Amino acid sequence: AYQGVEGSYGHGAALQYFGQDADVYHVKSMEDAMVEVEEGRADYAVLPIENSSAGAVSDNYDLLVKHNVYIVGETELAVNHALLGLPGATLEDIRQVYSHPQALMQCSQYLNSHRQWRQVSMENTAVSAKKVLEDADVTQAAVASEIAGKLYGLKVLQPSINYNKNNVTRFIILAK
């Protein structure tokens, strides 16, 4: 189990660790992923624990103490954020940018150079991409992977916007 939707970095980490044919599924929150393991519905949970640019994902450390799960493995995933918009959208159209708080932080130099853009935190990068597609509003953009952009039919308005070009997230694999 991983948090987010298909095309999220958690999804990518799960497939990287377990293989492309692995039976993986998504849940809404990091805590939900841990509960899936605790209650026996999933053998494993895949959660981000640390990023080379933004540091520790402290909420997940807190959840590790709260839940009866154990770290049984880890994998590192290269993270390369792009600014994604609807086909036909331009940078000049953008007014709101959606993404996970960690991704917004990792892209802060680029995003802050566009002061007119309102940054809106969401639970996941790929969820943000899906929202932009579903809302069909050219003033919206998402910070997510180019893979998520392709999956949800979005256009890359600006590739590689994270300030650390060697951006890596360490994911932990949890079991009961």
Enumerate the predicted regions with their spans.
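Domain-level signature for soluble enzymes in the chorismate/prephenate branch of the shikimate pathway
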Residues: 1-176
